[in-house]
């Protein structure tokens, strides 16, 4: 595996790969890689000839009181994990390489409406930071495909919208959620969960699973279901941020006759903010 720190060197390596007729897949990450990230890499490998992974802890998508400085930097372990699965390229730029004029002067990419709801409501500016850095990475790498995990469903939907609106020639591929044995979605932020909280940290997944059961049983009073699901999270000792039943494409509140819906939620533990989601196709119901 070759590691690059500079934009020009990445472009040269990928240009050579394309001259050899190879297709390129891209997996953007913030590092601290775990099995779910590696699953995305393997998924990309099954679809293209060459896979490049980026590791960049993007300050632009962290809020004023968020954990940018605490976010785990594990580049040596990350590099070893990627090499072990025969990843072709690792792009590991620093902030000066990505934002040479400083973040305040950086041109921003904003996806209206979708970025201000759900996680965007409690993390203002977060998705603006995501779409800005991802659009920049797409321009650097120019991949044929890019793989994003479904766990960050709102991010996935926003990236799809951005690619569609800006006519970026990349296919967005969704990677399934990888879960721990008890259903907790794998996340780099799981390392912030305290040992005391960990046995019940799957409560968000359990509440969304309960929500799914109610909907499959025919219940369509979505606001009442959302309130009940949040109550279940509170009863387990955690603080819900939101539980929302949404149209899978637009992220707008789902109508009772919507056939493709996604159940999204976020909750706070003492040390972490966790997100999860489940999607339903009600066409056969």
UniProtKB/Swiss-Prot annotation:
Coiled-coil residue windows: none
Active site residues according to the UniProt entry: 37
Binding site for ATP: 30-37, 149-152, 178, 186-189
Residues holding beta-alanine: 61
Domain of life: Bacteria
Enzyme class of the recorded protein, top EC level: ligase
Assigned keywords, A-Z: ATP-binding, Cytoplasm, Ligase, Nucleotide-binding, Pantothenate biosynthesis
EC identifiers of the protein: 6.3.2.1
Chief subcellular location: cytoplasm
Chain sites annotated for binding (R)-pantoate: 61, 155
GO molecular function, one term: pantoate-beta-alanine ligase activity
Entry's family note: Belongs to the pantothenate synthetase family.
Oligomer status and interactors: Homodimer.
Function description: Catalyzes the condensation of pantoate with beta-alanine in an ATP-dependent reaction via a pantoyl-adenylate intermediate.
Protein name, entry field: Pantothenate synthetase
Gene (name only): panC
């Amino acid at each position: 595996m070759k590691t690059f720190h500079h934009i020009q060197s990445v472009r040269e390596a990928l240009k050579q790969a394309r001259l050899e007729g190879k297709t390129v897949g891209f997996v953007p990450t913030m590092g601290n890689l775990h099995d779910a990230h590696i699953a995305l890499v393997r998924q990309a490998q099954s679809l293209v000839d060459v896979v490049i992974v980026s590791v960049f802890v993007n300050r632009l998508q962290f809020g004023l009181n968020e954990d940018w400085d605490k976010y785990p930097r594990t580049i040596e372990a990350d590099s070893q994990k990627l090499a072990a699965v025969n990843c072709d390229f690792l792009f590991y730029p620093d902030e000066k390489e990505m934002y040479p004029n400083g973040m305040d002067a950086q041109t921003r990419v904003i996806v209206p409406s979708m970025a201000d709801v759900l996680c965007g409501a409690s993390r203002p500016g977060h998705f603006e930071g995501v779409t800005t850095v991802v659009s920049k990475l797409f321009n650097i790498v120019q991949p044929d495909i890019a793989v994003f995990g479904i766990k960050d469903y709102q991010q996935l939907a926003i990236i799809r919208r951005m690619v569609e609106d800006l006519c970026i020639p990349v296919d967005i591929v969704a990677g399934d959620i990888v879960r721990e044995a008890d259903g907790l979605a794998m996340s780099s932020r799981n390392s912030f969960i305290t040992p005391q909280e960990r046995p019940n940290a799957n409560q968000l997944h359990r509440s969304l699973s309960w929500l799914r059961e109610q909907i499959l049983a025919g219940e369509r009073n979505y606001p009442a279901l959302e309130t009940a699901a949040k109550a279940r999270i509170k009863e387990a000792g955690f603080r819900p941020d939101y539980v929302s039943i949404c149209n899978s494409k637009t992220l707008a509140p789902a109508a009772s006759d919507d056939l493709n819906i996604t159940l999204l939620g976020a909750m706070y533990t003492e040390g972490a903010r966790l997100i999860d989601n489940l999607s339903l196709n009600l066409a056969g119901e």
